[in-house]
Amino acid sequence: DRENNTDLYYTLKVYLLNENNVTMAADSLHIHRNTLVYRLKQIRECIEADINDNETARELLAFMMMYDVSRQDQKRQK
Protein backbone atom coordinates (compact mmCIF):
# COMPACT_ATOMS: atom_id res chain seq x y z
CA ASP A 1 0.00 0.00 0.00
CA ARG A 2 2.68 2.51 0.97
CA GLU A 3 4.81 1.56 -2.02
CA ASN A 4 1.99 2.48 -4.41
CA ASN A 5 1.47 5.82 -2.66
CA THR A 6 -2.20 5.06 -2.16
CA ASP A 7 -4.26 4.57 0.94
CA LEU A 8 -6.01 1.30 0.26
CA TYR A 9 -6.86 0.84 3.93
CA TYR A 10 -8.75 4.12 4.09
CA THR A 11 -10.34 3.45 0.70
CA LEU A 12 -11.69 0.10 1.89
CA LYS A 13 -12.95 1.60 5.15
CA VAL A 14 -14.84 4.38 3.36
CA TYR A 15 -16.24 1.88 0.84
CA LEU A 16 -17.52 -0.36 3.64
CA LEU A 17 -18.91 2.59 5.61
CA ASN A 18 -20.83 3.58 2.48
CA GLU A 19 -22.38 0.11 2.40
CA ASN A 20 -20.38 -0.99 -0.66
CA ASN A 21 -21.84 1.80 -2.76
CA VAL A 22 -19.16 2.78 -5.30
CA THR A 23 -20.70 6.14 -6.21
CA MET A 24 -21.17 7.27 -2.61
CA ALA A 25 -17.71 6.06 -1.56
CA ALA A 26 -16.04 7.79 -4.51
CA ASP A 27 -17.84 11.01 -3.60
CA SER A 28 -16.77 10.67 0.04
CA LEU A 29 -13.17 10.11 -1.03
CA HIS A 30 -13.33 12.94 -3.58
CA ILE A 31 -12.04 10.65 -6.32
CA HIS A 32 -13.39 9.52 -9.68
CA ARG A 33 -15.57 6.42 -9.64
CA ASN A 34 -13.12 4.58 -11.93
CA THR A 35 -10.26 5.34 -9.53
CA LEU A 36 -12.24 3.72 -6.74
CA VAL A 37 -13.05 0.69 -8.90
CA TYR A 38 -9.32 0.31 -9.65
CA ARG A 39 -8.39 0.58 -5.96
CA LEU A 40 -11.07 -1.96 -5.02
CA LYS A 41 -9.59 -4.36 -7.57
CA GLN A 42 -6.19 -3.92 -5.92
CA ILE A 43 -7.73 -4.51 -2.49
CA ARG A 44 -9.48 -7.68 -3.64
CA GLU A 45 -6.20 -9.01 -5.01
CA CYS A 46 -4.37 -8.22 -1.75
CA ILE A 47 -6.84 -9.68 0.71
CA GLU A 48 -8.35 -12.39 -1.48
CA ALA A 49 -11.79 -11.88 0.04
CA ASP A 50 -15.21 -11.03 -1.34
CA ILE A 51 -15.63 -7.53 0.08
CA ASN A 52 -19.15 -7.37 -1.36
CA ASP A 53 -20.31 -10.27 0.80
CA ASN A 54 -22.31 -8.73 3.66
CA GLU A 55 -20.84 -10.93 6.39
CA THR A 56 -17.29 -10.41 5.15
CA ALA A 57 -17.86 -6.65 4.88
CA ARG A 58 -19.19 -6.48 8.46
CA GLU A 59 -16.25 -8.49 9.78
CA LEU A 60 -13.72 -6.37 7.92
CA LEU A 61 -15.28 -3.13 9.11
CA ALA A 62 -15.41 -4.35 12.71
CA PHE A 63 -11.76 -5.37 12.54
CA MET A 64 -10.78 -2.04 11.00
CA MET A 65 -12.58 -0.10 13.72
CA MET A 66 -10.91 -2.16 16.46
CA TYR A 67 -7.54 -1.64 14.77
CA ASP A 68 -8.10 2.12 14.60
CA VAL A 69 -8.99 2.27 18.30
CA SER A 70 -5.89 0.24 19.14
CA ARG A 71 -3.69 2.61 17.12
CA GLN A 72 -5.21 5.63 18.86
CA ASP A 73 -4.53 4.06 22.26
CA GLN A 74 -0.92 3.38 21.31
CA LYS A 75 -0.45 7.01 20.22
CA ARG A 76 -1.86 8.27 23.52
CA GLN A 77 0.52 6.09 25.51
CA LYS A 78 3.58 7.59 23.80
What residues fall within each predicted segment?
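Cytosolic nucleotide-utilizing catalytic cores of signal-transduction proteins
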Residues: 1-78
